[in-house]
Design a protein with these regions (language model features):
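Acidic, proline/glycine-enriched N-terminal capping motif
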Residues: 1-45, 53
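Proteins with a high burden of low-complexity, intrinsically disordered sequence enriched in S/T/G/P/A and R
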Residues: 3, 12-13, 28-33, 50, ...
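N-terminal glycine-rich flavin-associated loop
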Residues: 7-20, 62-69, 109-111
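Acidic active-site catalytic centers that drive phospho-/nucleotidyl reactions
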Residues: 8, 57, 163
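Residue-level detector of beta-strand structural context in well-folded domains
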Residues: 13, 45, 58-59, 140, ...
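Well-ordered mid-protein domain cores that form the structural environment of catalytic cofactors
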Residues: 33-87
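Conserved, structured C-terminal
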Residues: 64-348
Length: 348
């Protein structure tokens, strides 16, 4: 968060969607609306199951109305492609659309941090990375050595960031070039564990960790990603069910320990009761559980995310997280965004 770091994100799934009806198909597969989306831009998108629960997330990049590239989570890459194929063949066989995995056709590097624009300008010195010429969530193809690469301005850390897609044959040379061009900035290579911490500080979810198959976009504070004027998409009808819109559903919140020297364990129950040494005939009411928890060196205390029943109404209140030996840790319920809530850093 002070200079820059680089991550090898090649394992993320990448799917190419083509055809005369590609735009219609993408609009049906994801909650967002892509109808007015400009070419060479990307959009963070949610995919739901028929039950309205979050199935996957990723970035949808529009090359034109008949050509899209979407990213998926690593673990769901194959299932998302199968999900698309199933609906294309059984539900909408009249759509002129086809898709294929291009995950192994590109290595992907994620450069992130306040110095990332300077480093990108050194590595690709013929490209203008200014805000005017390269705004947030835009992308373009460029020549690099004797091949073509794609650069997308996006961030999963909350900092100014870029995703670089390069053929595997040129990946090592480009990786080395980043470090040669940034010696005075001490560019740091980082892995998925660090990425998990950085995204949690920003309140970004990981599907499968902060979701469990029973979570809707509204539960995750992501209702802004639902196209309000869309006639249909997978899961749309389910989102109107009475059980789905109850305020008492489990909702994503942030947790901060009252005692900043203490940590919070993932998977532990969140409760209202401090004293757990009660008779078994008085069972403790479990409000939810901790989905993600890390010690933040940037904030110098633990930060956690949790799914809590009626969580939005509990923001600002004090609850307790169970630990071993019938002990508890007092926590404050906060918005699930611990760093830069106004998103100023990634818009630099």
């Amino acid at each position: 968060r002070k200079t820059a770091g680089i991550l090898d994100g090649s394992t993320l799934g990448k799917i190419e969607i083509k055809g005369k009806d590609a735009l219609t198909f993408v609009n049906l597969m994801y909650t967002n609306s892509f109808t007015k989306m400009k070419p060479k831009t990307g959009r963070y998108a949610l995919m739901l199951g028929e039950d309205g629960m979050v199935k996957d997330d990723g970035i949808v990049c529009k090359i034109n109305d008949q050509h899209f590239i979407v990213t998926t989570t690593t673990g769901n890459a194959a299932s998302v492609l199968a999900h698309m194929e199933e609906y294309a063949q059984t539900e909408w066989p009249n759509l002129n659309v086809y898709m294929n995995s291009i995950t192994e056709q590109f290595a992907t590097f994620n450069l992130s941090g306040p110095k990332s624009r300077v480093i990108m300008s050194r590595v690709f010195n013929d490209i203008d990375f200014s805000n005017d010429q390269f705004p947030f969530m835009s992308f373009n193809n460029f020549k690099y050595l004797d091949t073509e690469i794609r650069i997308l301005r996006a961030s999963f850390t909350g900092e100014l960031g870029y995703e670089i897609y390069v053929p595997p044959s040129h990946a090592l040379k480009l990786w080395q070039r980043f470090f040669i061009s940034s010696r005075d900035f001490d560019l740091v290579p980082y892995g998925t564990e660090t990425m998990h911490l950085l995204r949690a500080e920003k309140g970004y979810i990981i599907v499968g960790q902060d979701t469990d198959g029973t979570v809707t976009p509204v539960d995750l504070n992501l209702n802004w990603m639902i196209g309000k004027k869309k006639k249909d998409f997978i899961g749309k009808r389910s989102l109107t069910r009475s059980d789905i819109i109850k305020e008492s559903r489990k909702q994503l919140v942030g947790l901060v320990p009252i005692d900043k020297t203490l940590g919070i364990e993932e998977g532990q129950h969140v409760i209202e009761q401090k004293d757990l040494s009660l008779p078994i005939k008085n069972p403790v009411d479990m409000l939810g559980h901790v989905t993600s928890s890390y010690f933040s060196p940037n904030l110098n205390h633990a930060v956690a995310m949790a799914l809590i029943r009626g969580g939005k109404r509990k923001i600002g209140s004090r609850l307790f997280v169970s630990t071993e030996n019938l002990n508890t840790i007092a926590v404050e319920v906060v918005e699930p965004n611990f760093i830069d809530p106004k998103n100023e850093r990634m818009m630099l």
